[in-house]
């Protein structure tokens, strides 16, 4: 009889500990921000990077009214190289293209891809996401630059003219680049769309880089307009970089507007 009582007490203690552990996780993470309940658990190891991490699940029904955020693009159709970095496909910009936000000018540096998307919208994942990365000037190695990243989501659909311009230029070998002739890849074929130039057509929030060192000095602008790319185009990029999306992170006290 004593063995039975001991076993019951041990079982109850185990259940209590499990319940407490689960409650701690729920206290830290809003599981509803994850597409799947277990996805929230991936956030735990990243807490050491801070509470303003990216990407996030953007809940459109909780979006605040825009408070006047506006970005101004001043870009040139000057992409100097296409790189196969192994973990992503990257296009490098020549100097001279900028984006301005709240009086700060950021220099276009590069754009790259994630398959599938890193950001979610109302729990929905998209097959691909493009990031256009801009930074403030690097003053010295001890200064952390500020970043402005434009996120563009893609769904499967018609062939994308901009992607077609460089897909065949991507080097086969990892960690190599291919120079781009002037005018061969036209950024205007991507950014001149009416939808992308509507200042009300994006989600904004403060966050981080989605790759090491996960720096938390990023102004994120994720466009609401979902662009199209053919399944073959998306598969071609995924075949090079694989599945390279970071798990979504807790939003904590931040808001999306």
Named regions from a protein language model:
Residues 13-14:
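Residue-level signal for mature regions of secreted extracellular proteins and peptides
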Residues 21-257:
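Alpha-carbonic anhydrase
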Residues 1-8:
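Bacterial N-terminal signal peptides that target proteins for export
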């Amino acid at each position: 009889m004593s063995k039975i009582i001991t076993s019951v007490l041990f079982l109850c203690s185990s259940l209590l500990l499990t319940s407490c552990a689960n409650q701690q996780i729920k206290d830290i993470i809003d599981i509803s921000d994850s597409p799947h309940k277990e996805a929230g658990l991936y956030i735990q190891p990243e807490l050491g990077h801070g509470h303003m991490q990216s990407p996030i699940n953007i809940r459109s029904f909780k979006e605040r009214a825009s408070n006047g955020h506006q970005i101004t693009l001043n870009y040139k159709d000057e992409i100097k190289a296409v790189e196969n970095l192994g973990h992503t496909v990257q296009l490098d910009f020549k100097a001279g293209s900028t984006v301005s936000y709240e009086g700060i000018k950021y220099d276009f540096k590069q754009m790259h891809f994630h398959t599938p998307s890193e950001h979610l919208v109302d729990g929905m994942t998209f097959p691909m996401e493009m990031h256009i990365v801009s930074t403030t000037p690097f003053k010295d190695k001890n200064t952390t630059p500020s970043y402005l990243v434009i996120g563009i989501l893609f769904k499967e659909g018609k062939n994308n003219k901009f992607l077609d311009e460089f897909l065949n230029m991507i080097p086969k070998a990892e960690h190599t680049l291919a120079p781009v002739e002037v005018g061969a890849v036209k950024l205007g074929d991507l950014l001149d769309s009416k939808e992308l130039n509507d200042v009300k057509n994006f989600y904004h929030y403060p966050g981080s880089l989605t790759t090491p060192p996960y720096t938390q000095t990023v102004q994120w602008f994720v466009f609401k307009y979902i662009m199209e790319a053919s399944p073959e185009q998306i598969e071609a990029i995924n075949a090079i970089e694989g599945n390279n999306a970071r798990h979504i992170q807790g939003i904590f006290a931040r808001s999306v507007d």
